[in-house]
Regions:
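A basic/glycine-biased coupling hinge at the interface between accessory DNA-binding modules
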Residues: 1-132, 156-159
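Conserved protein kinase catalytic core
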Residues: 9, 142-143
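Helical "lid/switch" subdomain of P-loop NTPase nucleotide-binding domains
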Residues: 126, 137, 144-148
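Hydrophobic residues in beta-strands of the RecA-like P-loop NTPase core, especially within AAA+ ATPase
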Residues: 134-141, 162
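Conserved RecA-like helicase ATPase core segment
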Residues: 143-162
Length: 162
């Protein structure tokens, strides 16, 4: 039995060779690690952390990843709004820093798993392992979690939602 995040961590430790530049030794940044990185990026970009609060920036990045938006797609979606463009700047730098450090955050466990499950050969291999999927608190799932479950369930779509 897995949570979405624990499944993602296990899956990615086995499949990271299919997602360069990562390898299976990646650390997983918790909320505090992510916030520290965002604070450092705000300093690098000369952005005031009172105007661009790290918690708010972190929530926007998390939301983007939950919608499976990579930094460039996020930037394209937000348009010309000044604040949103600065969030996009931080997101791009944040993503770059994670990759440089072979690190993932909690949202990446869902984001990257869903991306890799979109590759047919990988998806088929994992679909053979799971014949039924039970999702507790289904109403709390985000887009990435929904898509992950749908991809794993495959053609049988044996998903039980509680």
């Amino acid at each position: 039995m897995y949570t979405f995040h624990s499944f993602g961590a296990r899956f990615l430790r086995r499949e990271t060779s299919n997602y360069p530049p990562y390898n299976d030794k990646f650390p997983i940044y918790d909320s505090d690690d992510s916030k520290t990185l965002i604070k450092n990026i705000l300093k690098e970009l000369n952005l005031d952390d009172k105007q661009f609060q790290p918690n708010i920036i972190q929530a926007h990045i998390s939301s983007a990843k939950g919608q499976l938006l990579e930094p460039k797609a996020f930037r394209a979606q937000v348009g010309s709004n000044f604040f949103a463009q600065k969030v996009a700047d931080v997101y791009e730098s944040y993503d770059k820093h994670l990759k440089q450090n072979n690190a993932l955050d909690f949202d990446d466990l869902l984001f990257m798993t869903t991306k890799l499950l979109s590759i047919e050969s990988i998806r088929r291999r994992w679909q053979d392992r799971f014949h039924y999927i039970l999702i507790d608190e289904y109403q709390d799932t985000n887009h990435a979690q929904y898509l992950m479950a749908k991809l794993i369930a495959g053609k049988n779509q044996n998903i039980c939602a509680v």
